[in-house]
């Protein structure tokens, strides 16, 4: 009976013709990030402070580590698992060791988000703002940071990003999703996907991406514009590259179904809804079989999306 109920969840998703979804794993408690480990298992962080591991068809995830502080980013690098948490990044090993890599980072309204490995051997981390729209007192807020795997050489790569939740390298190019401010009304500003280069300023809090105008608004001298404008207040979060396009989850709003709760595709700069029917889609990754994996924070299910045979 449980297998039938889980299969019904996948059947409730709405996908374009030629694609289908299946349940990769279920029974998760608010999944936030995913990374495949050296053992081939998929490791998943849960915002309740746990990391679990799953394989395709898992209904009862295995606990890998507990006692974490709101883990939102995961990255396996060799035999070390890097975890971004509130104010810090830790390195975990299978034998039980736990090491602080970077600490003392600012957090309040937002915190540290995705962590990814760059082609230069450094690690890259999204660091959200401490407020909705204010002048930060800590230069590491509202930035993308980079550092060596041992935590040394911390640098600010880009600034002016209110909450750069998702990070993704496609070759040598770094992309980020950005959550826009909340104080400009229901129709502004756009959520953003940006292409990041060292030294970029993306404008927050004085400049924002206008969804109505599809251009920057406010005080925007020297600001780098986004490559895609997404629905306001939809919470653009997870990002993946699949079948030649960028895909982004829109988590939505906690108490409203008005915005988001969909998976969007960005093709040639145009944004369109690719899949709907989720509760709160959040994390994205691809698996070795070539599927796109979507972790639904709201339902505790990871879906595998693939092209129909």
Specify the residue positions occupied by each region the protein language model found:
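Beta-propeller domain segments
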Residues: 14-15, 112, 129-134, 139-152, ...
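Beta-strand-rich domains and repeat architectures in extracellular enzymes and scaffolds
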Residues: 22-49, 234-242, 247
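Conserved beta-strand position repeated across blades of beta-propeller domains
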Residues: 25, 32-35, 75, 116, ...
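Beta-rich catalytic cores
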Residues: 27-30, 47, 67-70, 111, ...
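Hydrophobic beta-strand segments that make up the repeating blades of beta-propeller
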Residues: 41-44, 80-83, 123-125, 174-176, ...
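Blade-loop segments of beta-propeller domains
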Residues: 51-78
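Asp-box/WD-like beta-propeller blade repeats and closely related beta-sheet repeat scaffolds
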Residues: 87-118, 126-129
